[in-house]
């Protein structure tokens, strides 16, 4: 979940910043010089949309390291760390990808993989997961993350996010132009976009960006089933992954720190933004899979 949430939040921030920079550079004035030029706007939206998604992908690994406080295992300090590195190496060889960077971070049971390229990725696990699972279950979780990398999920999500960004940028400026035209009705002395346009587009870039995140999260939930199946294939059997999922389902997630408690998402709205399907559905999918 960390992998996709970080990508989505980074993407929203990048697109919003690019939108502000474009405004400061006078791009919006060009787009609205003689009414709203929809063809030019579409080209601008494509560049902004996919540009924002690609930038988010390229910085995903350093952002993940910083935000999660990942400590890379460059030189294993004990037998457990050596086992984690060797397990990741073995699974990566099976999946035919380059050896990822391996890291550990403090926190509740969790793990993630990220990175722009299959042969230059990062796999990280939390101390809570290492303390609460058997080695077989940990291996299954690592296999799940390796499967994400091997399946090219970050690139796939980037393409999906790029399409959604394009719609966000295009719609926000069309709506912003309509709002600005309404507010300045009868004002024949003004030229170029007004304050209504700039405020509307900045706000809509953020609001529609989160709406687009619902679609991205829906695709992410479907990719999780593939990663579960990939882990089972790498392990040679389904039971370890099923056991790991059952263990995760029975673990109590850590409480949110007070500083970010207001950003916690629960209930029906939370389900729309959920990047992972319910544990029960994932276990059932593995049970029903052939092999």
From Swiss-Prot:
Cofactor: Zn(2+)
InterPro entries: HtpX_protease, Pept_M48_protease_HtpX, Peptidase_M48
Keywords assigned: Cell inner membrane, Cell membrane, Hydrolase, Membrane, Metal-binding, Metalloprotease, Protease, Transmembrane, Transmembrane helix, Zinc
Membrane topology of this protein: Multi-pass membrane protein
Pfam family membership, one: Peptidase_M48
Any one GO CC term of the record: plasma membrane
Active site, UniProt feature: 145
Membrane keyword on record: yes
Residues that bind Zn(2+): 144, 148, 224
Gene Ontology terms describing biological process: proteolysis
A GO MF label: metalloendopeptidase activity
Domain of life: Bacteria
Enzyme Commission number, as recorded: 3.4.24.-
Subcellular location: Cell inner membrane
Record CDD domains: M48B_HtpX_like (cd07335)
Membrane-traversing stretches: 4-24, 39-59, 159-179, 199-219
Textual note on the cofactor: Binds 1 zinc ion per subunit.
Alphabetical list of NCBIfam families matching this protein: PRK05457.1
Family of the protein in this entry: Belongs to the peptidase M48B family.
PANTHER family: PROTEASE HTPX
Protein name: Protease HtpX homolog
Organism from which the protein derives: Polaromonas naphthalenivorans (strain CJ2)
Lineage start: Bacteria, Pseudomonadati, Pseudomonadota, Betaproteobacteria, Burkholderiales
């Amino acid at each position: 979940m960390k992998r996709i949430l970080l990508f989505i939040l980074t993407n929203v921030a990048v697109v919003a910043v690019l939108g502000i920079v474009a405004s400061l550079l006078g791009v919006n004035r060009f787009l609205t010089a003689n009414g709203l030029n929809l063809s030019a706007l579409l080209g601008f939206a494509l560049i902004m949309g996919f540009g924002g998604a690609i930038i988010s992908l390229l910085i995903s690994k350093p952002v993940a390291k910083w935000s999660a406080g990942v400590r890379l295992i460059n030189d294993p300090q004990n037998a457990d760390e050596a086992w984690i590195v060797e397990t990741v190496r073995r699974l990566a060889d099976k999946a035919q990808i380059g050896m990822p960077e391996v890291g550990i971070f403090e926190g509740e049971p969790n793990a993630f993989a990220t990175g722009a390229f299959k042969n230059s990725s990062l796999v990280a696990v939390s101390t809570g997961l290492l303390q609460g699972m058997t080695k077989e279950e940990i291996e299954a979780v690592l296999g799940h993350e390796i499967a994400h990398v091997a399946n090219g999920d970050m690139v796939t999500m980037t393409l999906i996010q790029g399409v959604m960004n394009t719609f966000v940028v295009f719609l926000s400026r069309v709506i912003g132009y309509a709002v600005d035209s309404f507010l300045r009705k009868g004002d024949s002395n003004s030229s170029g976009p007004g304050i209504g346009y700039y405020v509307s587009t900045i706000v809509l870039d953020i609001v529609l960006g989160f709406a687009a995140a619902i679609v991205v999260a829906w695709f992410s939930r479907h990719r999780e089933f593939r990663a579960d199946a990939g882990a089972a294939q790498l392990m040679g059997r389904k039971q370890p992954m099923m056991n790991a999922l059952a263990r995760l389902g029975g673990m109590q997630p850590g409480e949110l720190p007070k500083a970010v408690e207001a950003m916690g998402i629960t209930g029906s709205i939370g389900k729309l933004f959920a990047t992972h399907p319910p544990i029960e559905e994932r276990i059932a999918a593995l049970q029903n899979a052939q092999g």
